[in-house]
């Protein structure tokens, strides 16, 4: 009886492992590719009106304009691209994927007070933290946070949506 129980447990464990293998194979064969992006399939598009034109944005997960929920976006910026001093009401997590992303804290854009973050760097910015940024070389950052993504410019005249 005890031997039969062990045999039954062994067979059950084996079947669970086989089931997992089929699940992994199904994912790898494209059944869930809408959740997977390679560099070639990233859906780059224009930035929203409240971000300076010239960069490209890709929404990878969620909806940054929704009233709630998580989002993940990538921002591709050309060399010299600047983001004026601003703040967000919700936390922002930033990972530098390529290039150099310079970030400064405060209400005035000052290149002497900026720290350089290179590929692989990560930072999280608490709500209401005033900051500004600049790309050195073509730079790609991934930003993750909670919706809605809101930019509040320290100087309202820096808001590009007012100039469009």
What are these regions (language model features)?
Residues 1-4:
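Positively charged n-region of N-terminal signal peptides that target proteins for export
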Residues 24-69, 156-164:
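A short, N-terminal "cap"/entry segment at the start of jelly-roll beta-barrel domains
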Residues 80, 107-128:
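Short acidic-glycine-tyrosine-enriched beta hairpin
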Residues 8-20:
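Bacterial N-terminal signal peptides
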Residues 78-81, 88-108:
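Glycine- and acidic-residue-biased ligand/ion/polar-headgroup-sensing regions
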Residues 83-85, 103-104, 125, 130-136:
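Short beta-strand His + acidic residue motifs that chelate non-heme Fe in jelly-roll/DSBH
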Residues 33-35, 112, 134-164:
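Double-stranded beta-helix
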Residues 57-61, 73-81, 85:
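N-terminal post-signal-peptidase region of extra-cytosolic proteins
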């Amino acid at each position: 009886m005890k031997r039969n129980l062990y045999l039954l447990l062994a067979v059950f464990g084996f079947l669970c492992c086989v089931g997992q293998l089929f699940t992994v194979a199904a994912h790898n064969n494209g059944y869930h590719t809408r959740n997977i992006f390679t560099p070639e399939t990233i859906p780059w598009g224009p930035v929203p009106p409240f971000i300076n034109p010239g960069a490209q944005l890709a929404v990878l997960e969620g909806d940054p304009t929704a009233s709630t929920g998580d989002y993940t976006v990538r921002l591709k910026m050309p060399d010299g691209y600047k983001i004026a001093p601003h703040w967000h009401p919700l936390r922002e997590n930033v990972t530098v994927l390529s290039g150099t992303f310079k970030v400064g804290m405060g209400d005035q854009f000052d290149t002497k007070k900026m720290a350089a973050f290179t590929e692989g760097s990560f930072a999280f910015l608490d709500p209401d933290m005033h900051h500004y940024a600049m790309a050195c070389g073509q730079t790609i950052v991934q930003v993750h946070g909670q919706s809605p993504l809101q930019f509040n410019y320290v100087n309202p005249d820096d808001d590009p949506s007012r100039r469009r």
